[in-house]
Amino acid sequence: MALPWIEKYRPKSFAEIVNQEEAKYTLASWICLKFRAPKEFCTRWAKKRDKEVAEAKAILLAGPPGVGKTTLVHALAREIRYELIELNASDVRTADRLRQVIGRGLRESSLFGFEGKMVLFDEVDGLHVKEDKGGLEEIIEIIETAKIPIIMTANNPYDPKFRPLRDISLVVNLKRLSEEEVVEVLRRICTSEGAKCEEEALRSIAKSSMGDLRAAINDLQMYLSGGRRILTLDDIKRVGERNPQLSMFEILDRVYKARWFDEARAVSFNPSFDWEQYFIWALESIPVVYKDLEIASTAYDRLSKADVFMGRIKRTQEWELLPYALELALGGVSQIKGKPRLPPFIKYGFPQRLLLLAKSKEARRRRDALVEYLAQNLHASKSVIKSEIIYVLSALSKNNQSIIEKLSKALGINAIDIKSVL
């Protein structure tokens, strides 16, 4: 079986990694200031002496998929001859499992003459704080006590739940690669594979990859599969281009920074576009983007009209109205007369509404369990339970604690939690 090209052409050294000089300098400086590393490596790459670099307890590499976060750590370990203990935080989630894997890795002796050990927590934003039984807290504990380099990667480390991790780490942002930089890498691979690739074909792959070099290399290998050694633009069009997944931050950025109406409208064609999520995020991002009250008011007016359309669609199933709703919500919010030139970087905040829903999730789960139990045993509808029975039980339980105790036993929920629901 052929080796995947993303592995075959993975950079082996710092010098081979494309256009991430700032990240390389910061990471190398941190290693050289706090740990043992070859003198020649430090002389070439350790360019920073900042206080925040020297005081960081760990490094958190942040950036979109395919920009080289994991590759950068592998190259670092190879350059300084450290054994890399790599864990994917999406797979090794619990505190017990983390302690088991890390503990074993640190206890075992290094083979092949390694100079030391370092730990990589890959995709740390894959952890779910509530569900993953202390995984995040254990990572923080490991960072606080470790005597070896701890490096993490994340696509989006700015979720509020990861603030404790950011507080003890230095966040190093990796840039999305430009179309030209991706094309240059693809060109080198074509030459190495003995394939004749049209420039327009390579540019089409690079453009659809949106700076994700890993995706671009995978696409190139797919187009040249089966022993093919010629790639044209017609081949790309015949097979079809990649439609990349976008985060909500990227969706908002594309909408607000669209240069014309159709460009903003086209965001809805992306498979990751979700109207409900977009509406919630847009509601809170409009005043962040548009400081002018009149422009912000116009944006809110168009978004509210789009919501009216969506409400009617849900009630009547008149899906022929959907284009009008999307044009108002996307193009209407983006293309406003007098709209100012927007800065390159806009700090979109995570919606407070979603944060409040997340915080109340457990309370709502307990309430739903209670309503379900009462509906089955009293042979009443859930709406009646919510609007009448709950209030009756609440009044009765104030003078009769046995009601709460019986419900607690029946549902397997702590009596204090039952009381909080009532």
UniProtKB/Swiss-Prot annotation:
Keywords of the record: ATP-binding, DNA replication, Nucleotide-binding
The keyword Signal is assigned to this record: no
Keyword check for ATP-binding: yes
The organism's place on the tree of life at top rank: Archaea
Residues that, per the record, bind ATP: 63-70
GO biological process assignments: DNA replication
GO-annotated molecular function: ATP binding; ATP hydrolysis activity; DNA clamp loader activity
Pfam families, A to Z: AAA (PF00004), RCF1-5-like_lid (PF21960)
InterPro entries given in the database record: AAA+_ATPase, ATPase_AAA_core, P-loop_NTPase, Rep_factor-C_lsu, RFC_lid
Known function: Part of the RFC clamp loader complex which loads the PCNA sliding clamp onto DNA.
Family as reported in the entry's similarity comment: Belongs to the activator 1 small subunits family. RfcL subfamily.
Record note on quaternary structure: Heteromultimer composed of small subunits (RfcS) and large subunits (RfcL).
Name of protein: Replication factor C large subunit
Encoding gene (name): rfcL
